[in-house]
């Protein structure tokens, strides 16, 4: 039998989908390239924003139409599944899988194939180990979830309610997974967590993200290590030192700020001020001068005034982010903001504010990217884009596109930058590593 998984949302969802695929293949199922070719269709959903949730419902609607034409089993997983639970069974799905029940996907599928309606929401994170099979989407880079859940409870965020409280994987188990990846030819890993900086605190055995990075960097074959996503008040001096001194740890930090207004930050329950955030950036840059810092900002949070917004503009100008992800505030049912704050900023004003910041960030990007003009940069070749060009990232997470060939994927290459934009850079390959490229994409 064949299965198809459609994934929405964050990298952790991608990693969960890789695990579900691995478990199904282990049980004899075969991946399909589209829902039309599949006997089992799983929609792995995201609830972080209203738009992402709407996309998942739209996909479900299309699959349920297909179900009327052919016999298929339909499952819903991810954060919307955790939030809406059995409601999906009422809508026509055959099984629903909670965020901590991913290791039980084959149980759900088998029961659904026998005609049962299945809802699994038990906590099975203890089965989320290095032994869990995965079908990975890259030949050289792997996602590795190191901590599940979040304890921060920002007032706008649904994640603590859908992903649960923080729980770290034992360091030894994570390192076993990384060793296994290195043996299979993987060269890059990204450690994932909703609040990745909190890794180890709940283990109470001295584990920390900084120590994990150090230990993982000792594994032969692993060339680069990334981590996502950081929370400002958990970003330790120890972590900064590791980024500064360890050549395998990426000089790239994603540090969401969400707003530049202290009043709004307090309403968001972000637990820091604009001044404290900027001071943290200064501390990181003083130790890691080459670091690239990116961030997230929400515009139009309840009661956000023009004055609040201009505080955010001021922060963006001072922070000089390499990348900035912008989102329009959308109320998430069940959150504190949804319950207590009126969504009172007009949508048109939210759009205007987002567009203003987008234009500002483009100017900043263009200016920062000028530093690359004429330089030769070492990247790991990732893939071929739709426009036919190949691309890769340097250790600062800068994307560089170039004319290449498929055999280059997964290898180091030196690219001389010839063209600058506000987004990717463009260049010419001057050297490519001659060692064999990794070919395995499954475990």
From Swiss-Prot:
Phenotype upon changing residue 154 to A: Decreased iron content and loss of activity
Iron-sulfur listed as a keyword:
yes
Q: Which biological process terms from the Gene Ontology are attached to this UniProt entry?
A: tRNA methylthiolation
Q: Which domain of life is it from?
A: Bacteria
Q: What chemistry does it catalyse, as a reaction equation?
A: N(6)-dimethylallyladenosine(37) in tRNA + (sulfur carrier)-SH + AH2 + 2 S-adenosyl-L-methionine = 2-methylsulfanyl-N(6)-dimethylallyladenosine(37) in tRNA + (sulfur carrier)-H + 5'-deoxyadenosine + L-methionine + A + S-adenosyl-L-homocysteine + 2 H(+); N(6)-dimethylallyladenosine(37) in tRNA + (sulfur carrier)-SH + AH2 + S-adenosyl-L-methionine = 2-thio-N(6)-dimethylallyladenosine(37) in tRNA + (sulfur carrier)-H + 5'-deoxyadenosine + L-methionine + A + H(+); 2-thio-N(6)-dimethylallyladenosine(37) in tRNA + S-adenosyl-L-methionine = 2-methylsulfanyl-N(6)-dimethylallyladenosine(37) in tRNA + S-adenosyl-L-homocysteine + H(+)
Keywords, ordered alphabetically: 4Fe-4S, Cytoplasm, Iron, Iron-sulfur, Metal-binding, S-adenosyl-L-methionine, Transferase, tRNA processing
Q: Does the keyword Cytoplasm apply?
A: yes
Cofactor(s) needed by this chain: [4Fe-4S] cluster
Cofactor binding description: Binds 2 [4Fe-4S] clusters. One cluster is coordinated with 3 cysteines and an exchangeable S-adenosyl-L-methionine.
Pfam families to which the protein is assigned, alphabetical: Radical_SAM, TRAM, UPF0004
Domain Radical SAM core per the UniProt entry, residue ranges: 136-367
Question: What's in the GO CC field?
Answer: cytosol
Q: Which residues form a coiled coil?
A: none
Q: What is this protein called?
A: tRNA-2-methylthio-N(6)-dimethylallyladenosine synthase
């Amino acid at each position: 039998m064949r299965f198809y998984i459609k994934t929405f949302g964050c990298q952790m969802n991608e990693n969960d989908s890789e695990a579900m695929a691995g478990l199904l293949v282990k049980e004899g199922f075969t991946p399909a390239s589209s829902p039309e070719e599949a006997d089992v269709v799983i929609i792995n959903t995201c609830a972080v924003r209203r738009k992402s949730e709407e996309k998942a419902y739209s996909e479900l609607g299309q699959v349920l139409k297909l179900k009327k034409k052919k016999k298929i089993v339909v499952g819903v997983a991810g954060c919307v599944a955790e939030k809406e639970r059995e409601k999906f069974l009422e809508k026509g799905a055959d099984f629903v899988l909670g965020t901590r029940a991913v290791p039980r996907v084959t149980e759900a599928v088998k029961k659904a194939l026998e005609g049962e309606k299945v809802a699994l929401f038990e906590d099975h994170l203890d089965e989320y180990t290095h032994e869990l099979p995965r079908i990975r989407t890259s030949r050289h880079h792997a996602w590795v979830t190191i901590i599940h859940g979040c304890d921060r409870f920002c007032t706008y965020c649904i994640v603590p309610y859908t992903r649960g409280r923080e729980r770290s994987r034992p360091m030894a188990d994570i390192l076993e997974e990384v060793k296994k990846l290195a043996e299979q030819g993987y060269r890059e890993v990204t450690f994932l967590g909703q609040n990745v900086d909190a890794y180890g605190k709940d283990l109470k055995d001295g584990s920390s993200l900084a120590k994990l990075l150090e230990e993982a960097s000792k594994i032969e074959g692993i060339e680069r290590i990334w981590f996502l996503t950081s929370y400002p008040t958990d970003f330790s001096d120890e972590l900064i030192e590791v980024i500064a001194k360890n050549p395998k740890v990426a000089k790239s930090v994603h540090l969401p700020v969400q707003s530049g207004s202290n009043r709004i930050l307090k309403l968001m329950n972000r637990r820091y001020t604009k001044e404290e955030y900027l001071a943290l950036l200064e501390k990181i840059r003083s130790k890691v001068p080459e670091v690239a810092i990116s961030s997230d900002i929400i515009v139009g949070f309840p009661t956000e005034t023009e004055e609040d917004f201009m505080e955010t503009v001021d922060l963006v100008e001072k922070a000089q982010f390499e990348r900035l992800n912008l989102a329009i505030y959308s109320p998430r049912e069940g959150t504190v903001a949804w319950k207590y704050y009126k969504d009172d900023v007009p949508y048109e004003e939210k759009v205007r504010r987002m567009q203003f910041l987008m234009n500002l960030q483009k100017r900043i990007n263009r200016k920062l990217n000028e530093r690359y003009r004429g330089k030769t940069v070492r990247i790991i070749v990732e893939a071929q884009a739709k426009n036919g060009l190949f691309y890769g990232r340097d250790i600062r997470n800068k994307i560089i596109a170039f004319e290449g060939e498929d055999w280059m994927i997964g290898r180091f290459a030196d690219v001389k930058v010839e063209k600058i934009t506000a987004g990717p850079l463009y260049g010419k390959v001057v050297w490519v590593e001659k060692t064999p490229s990794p070919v395995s994409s499954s475990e």
